[in-house]
């Protein structure tokens, strides 16, 4: 599987599982303690249906939004994660650069 073959969350997860050493994949893919919060957050998406607007032009799609008065090009928040250098040599700097490149937010842990 290649990046160009990824079309949804499950595809990206499969690719990561193939490419990363097992301990690093499980560190990223895992959750804290007994993973109850992870399971609840994940299962909450089972109750959400995305209903497409069929026959609507998609030549110009705008994902931008405004959060706290700042316009963002993407509605994503890149959260801090410990040990990011395990999966990229530049660690948090790489995530910060990506947030800047795509004009979205990146959190810093204290």
Report each predicted region and the residues it spans.
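Glycine- and other small-residue-rich loops at beta-strand/loop junctions that grip anionic moieties
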Residues: 30, 84, 108-109
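A short, structure-level motif marking secondary-structure boundaries and short turns
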Residues: 26, 79-81
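Hydrophobic faces of well-ordered beta-strands that scaffold small-molecule active sites
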Residues: 76-79, 104-108
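Conserved, mostly hydrophobic/aromatic
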Residues: 21, 78, 99
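An N-cap/entry alpha-helix motif that binds or orients negatively charged groups
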Residues: 1-72
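N-terminal active-site wall of soluble small-molecule enzyme domains
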Residues: 64-75, 83-98
